[in-house]
Amino acid sequence: MTSEAAPASTAVTYKRVMLKISGEALMGDQGYGLHPPTVQRIAREVQAVHRLGVEICMVIGGGNIFRGLQGSAQGMERTTADYMGMLATVMNALAMQAALESLGIFTRVISAIPMDQVCEPYIRRRAVRHLEKKRVCIFAAGTGNPYFTTDTAATLRANEMACQAIFKGTKVDGVYDKDPRKFADARRYETVSYDECLQKHLGVMDASAIALARDNDLPIIVFSLDEPGGFCGILRGEGTYTRVQG
């Protein structure tokens, strides 16, 4: 493993950011579970940003393993289903930690549900100190409470960590007025307001997450995680994306 901090090589727009990705982003074309080459590819995208000197927080969903709402829809008690989903996010966080550390990036998995033999408990001041030491912090187990999504967890942790923006990595290069994979005339927004996202149900994040970002003036940058170098490029003022703001 290499040194914990990487010197900044060029000017960047943000000093500290939250990267939110879905669990499905880790499964590649398999349809379920973890696809190690895909996890490694995403880790390399994070590595490129880390080399710029940016402090990185991450939240990863668990839908590639288990989704609480799905379990609830099939008759499982909602609270139990949500806790199972939270545990799935811990598995994904550990996989990403392993990939990042194989690239020489010191990484901490920090869980909202204590499991001391597996990862650290969430203590805000300790997490901030990790970031200051240029360690990547992956926040797992959502908020630790049922009925809250990992989108809401990402927005909550981004606010607590004083991140300057949330980067939402998706399958498309921004927010569209309709699904660009189904409609050739779909229009991409350069910028869009929090309220318009809520009113038009644009699917950026769930309503609670968008409202929390709006109330704290935290911009959301929606970009394609499949675009090589996309995450790093946006931080250098390049690339295609949508900015959600007030």
Curated annotation (Swiss-Prot):
An example Gene Ontology CC term for this record: cytoplasm
What does the record give as the organism's lineage? Bacteria, Pseudomonadati, Pseudomonadota, Alphaproteobacteria, Rhodobacterales
Task: Give the top-rank taxon of the lineage listed in the UniProt record for this protein.
Answer: Bacteria
Q: What is the organism field in this record?
A: Cereibacter sphaeroides (strain ATCC 17025 / ATH 2.4.3) (Rhodobacter sphaeroides)
Q: How is its activity regulated?
A: Allosterically activated by GTP. Inhibited by UTP.
Cellular compartment(s): Cytoplasm
Which gene codes for it? pyrH
Q: In which pathway does it act?
A: Pyrimidine metabolism; CTP biosynthesis via de novo pathway; UDP from UMP (UMPK route): step 1/1
Broad class of where this protein is predominantly found: cytoplasm
Which reaction is recorded as catalysed by this protein? UMP + ATP = UDP + ADP
Provide the E.C. number(s) assigned to this enzyme. 2.7.4.22
Q: Which sites bind ATP?
A: 20-23, 63, 67, 170, 176, 179
Protein name per Swiss-Prot or TrEMBL? Uridylate kinase
**Entry-linked CDD domains:** AAK_UMPK-PyrH-Ec (cd04254)
What family classification does the UniProt entry report for this protein? Belongs to the UMP kinase family.
Q: What does the record note on quaternary structure?
A: Homohexamer.
Identify the residues that bind UMP. Answer: 62, 82, 143-150
InterPro entries given in the database record: AceGlu_kinase-like_sf, Asp/Glu/Uridylate_kinase, Uridylate_kinase, Uridylate_kinase_bac
